[in-house]
């Protein structure tokens, strides 16, 4: 029978989980039916490609857990839709995706983002309660539920949020293994380790720390037995990874070549970069400072766990000093550990002050985290500048007009003419079964839609070996190329890297050969800046909080120019 204390504890837990859910689920429809997150199509398109070319994803930059998990979700959606008469066959399923991918992205964002995000909050509570105390568990979950970095990334389809859940479970199961070295704890730790690495390879960064702490910190087994135990864990983990990601081994050459190429995208960022940018914006200085105090205080009560958390944070952060990209999501694995340490620190510090002061300070800490998340959700609910711009184009520019854009992503996602789509069949990549089928469906949809002759500025030569298939045709960045296609309008967004396109625009504007006919700003009316403060949040919403609060909507600053004949 549950006591009043149990009932109160459950009410608090459910309240925190409800808060975590609301902060993550509100706004998950942002941009749809257009996709305004650069990385989401990577997962979604490779997921749907399984239906055309089989289980080998032919994509190994990310492990396949997210792809296979999403495929199962789509399979359930297809079966349910077919039984209800929504889909007649796989072709109609694909046509539905290309006509309006809203349902597909909502499914992905909910299950890979929201669901795994809330589950991670719950699991952190569970781990903290088992290995620390109830107060630490409550504050851990509370701090994590309002963590801007985790809440914002939980709106997206990508591998990071499942990774965080598996890392929290992996951390908890390691503590279980340390305290009770027996078969069930070894298996649990091994399974979560295998799943974590199958979500994202960076989970492996935590293994050297776990191995050394188990080998030299665990006192319940002789040294030789500890080696055998961890060898067993390694074998089971590898087996779990192989089950989830079999083509890592079956297509080893393809895997190796992609991973080797990806290493060029990561490099040295500086010692304090991720601290000042990713963690300061994503977790917040109050939580970071509380975490430091918490680790210090934890040394007096849970010395092994304090040292473990500190070592995990420092080792993971240290690797990302030298091998990382500038995006905040690379620090997501540290967020639950910092929230746990901060919760312990708050539990200790809070005992030394009065009730009023304690509640007031806690409220300020929470507001500092929750207000950015709430404002982000508000922005997610508003129209993106690309949507506003597209509405203007549909009302003011004739279908079939020749439009040139400086970016396929940072400008409105307009539909190309059937003739332009037809020309893609002869380009590199079109022979891929999934892409060929997509072209067939795109051409079918374009026949009944509002289409434009779209060109994308690029320094690459527009031949079969250049650029991405669905960005083509490409256009050299010069005035002669514009004249050659009889360009009628230029669409300039100020978030791409095509600086030469901006220079050309300035030259033509100064020469009186362009006329500005419309502009669309994401910023407040008093803010006329075209380029964003946050130079690295180029996937979806801002990560820099200054950039966030400057905005009245998401999206780039856009300008449309009419080319004078």
Predicted regions and their residues:
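C-terminal luminal/periplasmic domains and tails of membrane-associated envelope-modifying transferases
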Residues: 1, 388-565
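Membrane-interface transmembrane helices that cradle and orient dolichyl/undecaprenyl
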Residues: 2-3, 129-131, 135, 170-188, ...
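Short hydrophobic alpha-helices at membrane interfaces in multi-pass membrane enzymes
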Residues: 11-14, 135-141, 173-195, 307-313, ...
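Transmembrane-helix motifs of polytopic, lipid-linked glycan transferases
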Residues: 14, 18-21, 98, 102, ...
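Signature aromatic-anchored transmembrane alpha helix within multi-pass, membrane-resident enzymes
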Residues: 14, 191, 234-235, 299-302, ...
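Interfacial juxtamembrane loops and adjacent helix segments
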Residues: 35, 56-112, 253-266, 414-427
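Transmembrane-lumen/periplasm boundary regions of multi-pass, lipid-linked membrane glycan transferases
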Residues: 66-69, 79-81, 195, 208-301, ...
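Hydrophobic/aromatic-rich transmembrane helices and adjacent perimembrane loops
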Residues: 153-154, 160-163, 196, 205, ...
């Amino acid at each position: 029978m549950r006591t009043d204390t149990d009932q109160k504890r459950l009410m608090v837990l459910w309240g925190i989980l409800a808060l975590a859910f609301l902060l993550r689920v509100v706004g998950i429809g942002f941009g749809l039916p257009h996709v305004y997150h650069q990385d989401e199509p990577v997962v979604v398109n490779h997921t749907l490609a399984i239906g055309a070319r089989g289980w080998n994803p032919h994509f190994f930059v990310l492990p396949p857990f997210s792809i296979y998990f999403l495929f199962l979700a789509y399979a359930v959606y297809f079966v349910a839709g077919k039984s209800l008469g929504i889909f007649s066959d796989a072709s109609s399923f694909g046509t539905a995706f290309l006509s309006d991918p809203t349902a597909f992205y909502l499914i992905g964002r909910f299950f890979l983002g929201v669901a795994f995000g809330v589950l991670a909050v719950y699991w952190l509570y569970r781990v903290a309660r088992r290995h620390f105390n109830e107060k630490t568990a409550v504050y851990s979950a509370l701090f994590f539920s309002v963590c801007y970095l985790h809440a914002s990334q939980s709106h997206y389809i990508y591998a990071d949020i499942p990774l965080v859940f598996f890392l929290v479970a992996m951390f908890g199961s390691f503590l279980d293994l340390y305290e009770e070295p027996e078969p069930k704890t070894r298996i649990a730790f091994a399974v979560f380790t295998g799943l974590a690495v199958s979500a994202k390879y960076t989970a492996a960064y935590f293994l050297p720390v776990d191995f050394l702490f188990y080998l030299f910190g665990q006192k319940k087994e002789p040294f030789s037995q500890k080696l055998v135990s961890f060898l067993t864990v390694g074998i089971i983990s590898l087996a779990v990874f192989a089950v989830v990601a079999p083509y890592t081994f079956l297509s080893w050459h393809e895997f190796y070549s992609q991973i080797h190429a990806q290493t060029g995208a990561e490099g040295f960022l500086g010692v304090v970069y991720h601290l000042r940018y990713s963690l300061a914006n994503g977790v917040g200085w109050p939580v970071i400072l509380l975490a430091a105090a918490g680790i210090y205080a934890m040394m007096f009560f849970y010395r092994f766990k304090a040292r473990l958390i500190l070592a995990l944070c420092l080792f993971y952060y240290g690797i990302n000093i030298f091998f990382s990209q500038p995006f905040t999501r690379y620090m997501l694995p540290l967020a639950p550990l910092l929230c746990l340490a901060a919760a312990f620190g708050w539990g200790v510090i809070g005992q030394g002050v009065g009730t009023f002061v304690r509640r007031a300070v806690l409220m300020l800490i929470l507001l500092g985290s929750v207000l950015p998340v709430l404002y982000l959700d508000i922005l997610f609910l508003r129209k993106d500048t690309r949507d506003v711009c597209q509405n203007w184009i549909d009302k003011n520019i004739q279908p079939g007009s020749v439009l040139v854009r400086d970016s396929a992503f940072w400008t409105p996602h307009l539909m190309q003419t059937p003739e332009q789509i037809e020309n893609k069949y002869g380009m590199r990549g079109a022979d891929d079964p999934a892409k060929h089928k997509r072209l067939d469906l795109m051409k079918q949809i374009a026949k009944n839609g509002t289409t434009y002759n779209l060109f994308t500025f690029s320094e690459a030569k527009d031949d079969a070996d250049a650029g991405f298939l669905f960005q083509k045709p490409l256009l050299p960045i010069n005035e002669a190329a514009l004249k050659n296609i009889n360009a009628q309008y230029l669409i300039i967004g100020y978030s791409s890297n095509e600086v030469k396109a901006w220079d050309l625009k300035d030259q033509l504007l100064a020469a009186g050969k362009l006329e500005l006919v419309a502009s669309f700003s994401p910023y407040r009316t008093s803010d006329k800046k075209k380029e964003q403060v946050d130079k690295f949040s180029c996937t979806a919403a801002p990560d820099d909080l200054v950039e966030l609060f400057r905005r009245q909507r998401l999206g780039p600053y856009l300008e449309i120019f009419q080319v004078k004949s």
